[in-house]
C-alpha cells in the first residue's frame, strides 16, 4: 500500500499518471522491512525443523552465552545475570531428529532412515507446519542427505516450502547455519507473498520488467528468487537507504554520514565512513539470532512509529508488537485502539496532526489522548502528558 501511495503522490507532483511513470521505468528496485517486522514481532510461519538425531536442541543450547546475549545492546549484554533467554522462533515441539550422519570429511557415517523421516515430516505437518527447515551436521561438506530429505518433503508435504541449510548458508558453524536456515523458513512464505503481490500490482499498473529486491549486502536480486532466499533481504529497506545516502553524499561532497530509518516497527541506524559500507560477517538479526550471511552493518531496535505501548500493571513497556500501517496508531482513525509511539508524539506536540505526511493525511488527537489515557495513564496513575512522555522516554 505504501509503495502505491508514494507512486500516486509522485504522479500528482509530476502532473502525470502512475501508469505513465511505470511504463517508462527500466529498473524498479524495492527495499522492504516486511520480513524484518515479522521476525521482530514473531509473526512468521509455523516452522517444522529437522536436525540430525541427537542435536535437536541446537537452537536452545545455542553457542553458550553468545546465544543468550548476542544481539542485545552492550549495556544489557554486560548485565548477564538479569538477561532473559531469547524468545525462540520455533517451539521445541516442532523439532524432530533424523537418523543419519555425515562426517566432517563429507563421508556418510550412517545412512538416512527414510521411513522414520517420512513419519517425522507427517507428524510436523499434522502439528501445523507451514514451512520446513532442514539442518544436518556437515551438510555443507556433503549435501546428499539434505537433498534427499528435500525430495521426500515434497512427496509427503507438497506445497510446503522447504529450506535446506546447504543451500541457504553452506558454511561451518552449526548454530549460525541452523538459525539462518530456520529464519529463512520462518519469513519465507510471508516475504514471497508480499513481493509477489507487489510485483503483480506494479505489472498491472504498467511496469514492464519484474521488480528487483534490494538485499542485505546492498545488491539486488530478482523477485522470483526471494522466496527461496528470504533471509537475504532482511533489513533491505534500511540498507537501501544507506546505498541512497552514499549516492547523495557523493553528490553533496560528504563521505561521513549517519543514517536513521524509522518505520512502524523498527528504528535502524547505519554509518557511512568513506566510499564503502561497513560489513558485518555474521550479524544478529534480533536477540539470539545470528546469521551466517554477511550484511551491511546496521543497528536495529524494535521500536518504531507504530510500536504499541503497554503496561503489565507495574511498568510501562513499548514494543515489540506494532500496530503497523493498518489499523495503525489510534490517531489514524482506522479502528486502532492501542496507544503507539506516534500517538505519544501527537499528544506531546512533536507531530502536527494537520500536517502529517506533508499534509496528505490528518490525524485525530482525541483518539490518541483516549488510547494513552485509558491504556497507560489510568492503570499507572499518570496524567495524559506524563504517560505520553513516558512512552517516548
Enumerate the language-model features and the residues they cover.
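N-terminally biased helix-coil "hinge/interface" segments that flank
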Residues: 1-393
Amino acid at each position: 500500500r505504501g509503495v502505491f501511495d508514494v507512486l500516486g503522490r509522485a504522479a500528482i507532483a509530476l502532473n502525470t499518471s502512475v501508469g505513465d511513470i511505470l511504463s517508462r521505468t527500466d529498473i524498479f528496485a524495492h527495499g522492504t522491512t516486511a520480513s524484518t517486522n515479522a521476525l521482530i514481532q514473531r509473526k512468521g510461519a509455523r516452522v517444522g525443523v529437522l536436525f540430525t538425531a541427537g542435536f535437536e536442541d541446537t537452537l536452545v543450547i545455542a553457542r553458550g552465552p553468545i546465544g543468550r546475549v548476542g544481539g542485545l545492546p552492550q549495556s544489557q549484554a554486560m548485565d548477564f545475570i538479569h538477561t532473559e533467554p531469547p524468545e525462540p522462533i520455533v517451539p521445541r515441539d516442532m523439532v524432530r531428529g533424523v537418523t543419519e550422519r555425515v562426517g566432517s570429511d563429507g563421508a556418510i557415517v550412517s545412512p538416512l532412515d527414510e521411513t522414520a523421516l517420512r513419519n517425522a515430516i507427517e507428524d510436523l505437518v499434522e502439528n501445523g507446519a507451514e514451512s520446513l527447515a532442514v539442518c544436518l551436521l556437515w551438510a555443507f561438506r556433503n549435501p546428499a542427505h539434505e537433498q534427499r530429505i528435500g525430495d521426500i518433503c515434497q512427496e509427503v508435504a507438497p506445497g510446503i516450502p522447504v529450506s535446506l541449510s546447504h543451500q541457504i548458508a553452506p558454511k561451518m558453524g552449526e548454530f549460525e547455519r541452523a538459525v539462518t536456515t530456520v529464519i529463512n523458513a520462518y519469513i519465507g512464505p510471508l516475504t514471497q507473498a508480499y513481493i509477489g503481490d507487489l510485483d503483480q500490482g506494479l505489472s498491472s499498473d504498467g511496469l514492464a520488467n519484474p521488480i528487483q529486491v534490494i538485499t542485505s549486502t546492498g545488491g539486488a536480486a530478482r523477485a522470483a528468487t526471494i522466496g527461496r532466499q528470504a533471509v537475504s533481504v532482511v533489513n533491505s529497506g534500511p540498507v537501501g537507504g544507506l546505498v541512497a545516502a552514499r549516492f547523495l553524499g557523493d553528490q553533496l561532497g560528504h563521505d561521513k554520514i549517519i543514517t536513521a530509518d524509522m518505520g512502524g516497527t523498527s528504528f535502524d541506524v547505519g554509518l557511512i565512513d568513506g566510499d564503502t559500507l561497513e560489513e558485518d560477517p555474521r550479524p544478529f538479526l534480533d536477540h539470539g539470532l545470528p546469521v551466517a550471511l554477511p550484511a551491511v552493518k546496521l543497528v536495529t531496535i524494535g521500536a518504531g512509529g507504530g510500536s504499541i505501548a503497554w503496561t503489565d500493571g507495574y511498568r510501562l513497556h513499548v514494543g515489540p508488537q506494532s500496530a503497523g500501517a493498518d489499523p495503525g496508531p489510534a490517531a489514524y482513525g482506522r479502528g486502532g485502539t492501542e496507544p503507539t509511539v506516534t500517538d505519544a508524539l501527537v499528544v506531546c506536540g512533536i507531530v502536527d496532526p494537520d500536517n502529517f505526511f506533508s499534509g496528505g493525511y490528518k490525524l485525530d488527537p482525541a483518539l490518541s489522548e483516549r488510547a494513552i489515557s485509558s491504556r497507560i495513564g489510568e492503570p499507572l496513575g499518570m496524567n495524559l502528558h506524563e504517560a505520553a512522555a513516558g512512552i517516548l522516554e
